[in-house]
Swiss-Prot record:
Family the UniProt entry places it in: Belongs to the complex I subunit 3 family.
Gene: ndhC
Protein name from the UniProt record: NAD(P)H-quinone oxidoreductase subunit 3, chloroplastic
Reaction catalysis annotation: a plastoquinone + NADH + (n+1) H(+)(in) = a plastoquinol + NAD(+) + n H(+)(out); a plastoquinone + NADPH + (n+1) H(+)(in) = a plastoquinol + NADP(+) + n H(+)(out)
Assigned keywords, A-Z: Chloroplast, Membrane, NAD, NADP, Plastid, Plastoquinone, Quinone, Thylakoid, Translocase, Transmembrane, Transmembrane helix, Transport
Root EC class: translocase
GO molecular function: NADH dehydrogenase (ubiquinone) activity; quinone binding
Amino acid sequence: MFLLHEYDIFWAFLIISSVIPILAFLISGVLAPISEGPEKLSSYESGIEPMGDAWLQFRIRYYMFALVFVVFDVETVFLYPWAMSFDVLGVPVFIEALIFVLILIVGSVYAWRKGALEWS
């Protein structure tokens, strides 16, 4: 039988962890001094007047490199618990993890051939 009272601690932590950041933003918005002017609208470059436009457009290669990094980072997050409980789970879960890794290898080969891993 599914009992909700077993999750009281979870709900308490969820509520507390949601309320604290909201309160921090509200309190800082109320207590912070409001100072608007031309200095606030200019960008800060090491204490000197800005030279040129402050808005830069990054090349798409940086985003592709970051996206590939996130994919392999998520792979590590999924494979670590599997590796810690490998002896308990058995062969069927090993085959599933092997399929998961093979799909990621195919994806990395695809990204490599498309040039997403080249920095220059």
